[in-house]
Regions:
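Tandem repeat scaffolds
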Residues: 1-157
Length: 157
């Protein structure tokens, strides 16, 4: 893949772009707008380090993310509405108050994430481990909320 290192993106707009295999390292992104774009096999975790002082994304609209890794990021309160996240990874990601309202999350995995007060109503196809994620106050809707029971070993008839 392509390594983007020691760069700074402030208030940039990426519209009708296709990115594949990009790994960010020691790079800052602040309030970037991602519009009508596709992102494949991206590793976003190196964008902001571990500080979480600012949001890398200002807005996402009509974007598809496939095989993206958002591990270790601070994305509290971010609105993912209108995005498609397929086979993505959120490990140790801060997503408190984030909105995934109506988002297709096919095969997307959440592990050791803070999803407190997150909105997953009408979100589809997610995999969220009840034991490792913080979910207090998170909002879900039926029937997809039943997916939370996948890892428990219980039988639903």
């Amino acid at each position: 893949g392509t390594r983007v290192q020691n760069c700074r993106f402030n208030a940039c707009t990426f519209d009708h772009c296709n990115f594949s295999g990009v790994v960010f390292s020691f790079t800052t992104m602040k309030d970037a707008w991602l519009l009508n774009s596709a992102f494949r096999s991206m590793a976003w975790g190196g964008l902001q380090g571990k500080s979480g002082v600012f949001q890398p994304f200002g807005k996402i609209k009509n974007c598809a993310f496939r095989y993206n890794d958002f591990s270790g990021m601070a994305l509290n309160g971010f609105d993912w509405t209108g995005a498609e996240l397929q086979q993505c990874t959120f490990d140790d990601t801060r997503l408190a108050g984030a909105s995934f309202y109506g988002v297709r999350l096919g095969g997307t995995r959440f592990t050791r994430c803070d999803l407190q007060k997150a909105d997953l109503r009408t979100a589809e196809e997610y995999a969220i481990d009840l034991e490792t994620n913080k979910l207090k106050g998170a909002r879900f809707s039926f029937p997809d909320v039943v997916r939370l029971l996948d890892g428990t070993g219980i039988v639903i008839e």
